[in-house]
UniProtKB/Swiss-Prot annotation:
GO terms for molecular function: dCTP diphosphatase activity; dTTP diphosphatase activity; dUTP diphosphatase activity; magnesium ion binding. This is Nucleoside triphosphatase NudI. PANTHER family: GDP-MANNOSE MANNOSYL HYDROLASE (PTHR43046), MUTT_NUDIX FAMILY PROTEIN (PTHR43046:SF14). Signal peptide: none annotated.
């Protein structure tokens, strides 16, 4: 089984948290709401990977004022690729508390939508298992 280390920002701005809706035809959690983030490349430093993933997935106009390592988690997930093939992967999630100075987001093709969500409204979203676990650990669900 392949192993992936994932950097995952829990981005907050003015009391709301950023959720991204995965595209229906790709990813580990197609069509569900998730946190952004992605894999650490070989030889890449963890914070560099976090900043790269944010830039790739959310655009280069989102300004992070603060990045704090928070916790980690792991599990086994079935990834569905765009061509319909599937792969079981051991995932290690490195989760960071992030505070943004703005809300300027330009999502890439991995996502179909995004939302800034107040804590009291998070439970109304179809959150993927990993995001639900993270938000519960944080005391937000």
């Amino acid at each position: 089984m392949r192993q992936r280390t994932i950097v995952c920002p829990l981005i907050q701005n003015d009391g709301a948290y950023l959720l991204c809706k995965m595209a229906d035809d790709r990813g580990v959690f197609p069509g569900q709401w998730a946190l952004s983030g992605g894999g650490v490349e070989p030889g890449e430093r963890i914070e560099d990977a976090l900043r790269r993933e944010i830039r790739e997935e959310l655009g280069d106009k989102l300004i992070l004022q603060k990045i704090t390592p928070w916790t980690f988690s792991d599990d086994v997930r079935m990834k569905t690729y765009a061509d319909g093939t599937k792969e079981e992967i051991y995932m290690i999630y490195l989760i960071f508390d992030c505070v943004s100075a703005n809300r300027e987001i330009t999502i890439n093709e991995e996502f179909q939508d995004f939302a800034w969500v107040k804590p009291q409204d998070l439970a109304q979203y179809d959150l993927n298992v990993a995001t639900r676990k993270t938000l519960s650990l944080k005391g937000l669900l």
